[in-house]
Amino acid sequence: MTKLKDITGKALSGEWGTDDETGVGIPVLRTTNFTNEGIVNYENVVTRIITKKDISEKYLQSGDIIIEKSGGSDKQPVGRVIYFDGPENTYLFNNFTGLLRVRDKNEWFPRYVFYSLFANYKKGGTRPFENKTTGLHNLKTDDYVSRYEITEIPLNKQVAICAQLDQILKVINLRRKEISNLDDLIKPDLSRCLVIRKLIQRDGLKSRFQKN
């Protein structure tokens, strides 16, 4: 077992800057761009004016893992992770999130590290590291990164496992989309059925009164 801190180092803090009134700011990913499937949602990405000079290492690279530091709720713990595979040197991440970047990709496959964190979150592994304040759930990020451990296996096995998991997730997401599309088809029919039912009930009552 290897500690996450030895794989990625401490989580880098995000940037927020100031309002972009000119439309030429830097796109910044927020927790609203997180999905529960670990995929980045690029809808409604905000742009911000960030003037710090030492942010070059914070531009997102392929294989970066973004972890949620603040957010969540009583039903949804803080600590979600998303895997970044978008265009490099384009996006930053905000101050409610942190960046985990694998140091040695010859030893650790970033996708494997992501899946380990993703699975740990799904089983509630971040809850012991929550610090609740008024209306907010904060992740004790440094503590979590220092104590969380990942099973060390050869790189080729890491890649093979991730290929299998990617395929499984692809099938799951496809099924979810099919179910969602089916719901969209069924809802109008259900609405029609309810209208017809009300008409039958109304007309049935009228007929009964007319007979009496």
Tell where the protein language model's regions lie, with residue ranges.
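Short coil/turn segments at secondary-structure boundaries
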Residues: 17-24, 128-130, 202-207
